[in-house]
């Protein structure tokens, strides 16, 4: 994990920051204030965008960033070097690891397990194992930007629903962790955390993309078209026509996309 380029991660980061649920974040982080030592583990870290968001809000926390892409972690390490100039004792550790196997040692000594835009890619069994490991470590959980299946395109176009439905079918195919949770990720995370003894909060964290996100919109639209065509190659002409119409709206400065996500937080109140 991660399988995404540094350029893509940089492009989406402002939309991610704007989308996140401040309520879910504040609820989880406030439960950790005063806890020492305090270490967070971020899974599928990429270039460290999740830590750029969280560290100023939890300035006494050390971080372990975990990804299978050493090049992205190198970008993260350099970008995060002076993240908290007031907190000179903050330690940023990076670890190259295969998240598919989710070695329990990755969570050693952690009080918080985080990830961003990860859970919709993983399987139910993988998520259940993560919840068990987090509980056994005594760690709270904060999982941001889980895709939930909602796509609203404006102005509306013929075949918006067709493409959305194909995208959502594609979302549950194997992304390297077994059959992916896709749009069910947030709901299943909420249920599994609650069953494991966590107090859980979940709230929308939708991408709202306007003219200022033109390049992000373009890449999202083209990505949807690619996924839809993979599942329904016989519908390729319709999907291509839809793509051209959506890009025309984008070129005219009138395109607006809402892409549904949710954030899930878990505060551990019982040890099983």
Language-model features, listed with the residues they occupy:
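Class I SAM-dependent methyltransferase SAM/SAH-binding core
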Residues: 54-101
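Conserved catalytic/acceptor-binding region of the Class I
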Residues: 139-204
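C-terminal helical/coil "lid" or tail adjacent to the Rossmann-like core of SAM-dependent
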Residues: 201-252
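Glycine-rich SAM-binding Motif I of class I
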Residues: 48-52
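Conserved S-adenosyl-L-methionine
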Residues: 44
């Amino acid at each position: 994990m991660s399988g995404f380029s540094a350029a893509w991660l940089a492009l989406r980061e402002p939309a991610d920051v704007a989308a996140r649920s401040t309520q879910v974040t504040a609820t989880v982080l406030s439960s950790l204030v005063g806890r020492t030592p305090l270490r967070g583990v971020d899974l599928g870290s990429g270039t460290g965008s999740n830590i750029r968001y969280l560290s100023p809000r939890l300035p006494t926390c050390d971080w372990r960033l975990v990804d299978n892409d050493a090049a992205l972690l190198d970008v993260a390490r350099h970008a995060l070097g002076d993240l908290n100039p007031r907190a000179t004792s903050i330690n940023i550790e990076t670890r190259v690891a295969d998240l598919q196997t989710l070695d329990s040692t990755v969570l050693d000594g952690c009080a918080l397990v985080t990830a961003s835009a990860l859970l919709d890619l993983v399987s139910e069994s993988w998520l259940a194992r993560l919840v068990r490991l987090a509980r056994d470590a005594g760690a709270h959980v904060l999982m941001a930007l889980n895709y939930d299946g909602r796509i609203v395109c404006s102005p509306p176009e013929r075949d918006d629903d067709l493409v959305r439905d194909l995208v959502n079918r594609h979302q549950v195919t194997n992304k390297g962790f077994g059959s992916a949770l896709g749009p069910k990720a947030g709901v299943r995370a909420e249920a599994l955390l609650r069953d494991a003894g966590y107090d859980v909060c979940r709230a929308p964290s939708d991408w709202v993309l306007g003219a200022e996100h033109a390049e992000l919109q373009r890449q999202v639209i083209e990505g949807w078209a690619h996924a839809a065509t993979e599942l329904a190659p016989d519908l390729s002409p319709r999907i291509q026509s839809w793509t051209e119409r959506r890009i025309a709206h984008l070129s005219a400065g009138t395109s607006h996309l809402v892409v549904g996500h949710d954030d899930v937080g878990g505060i551990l109140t019982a040890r099983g």
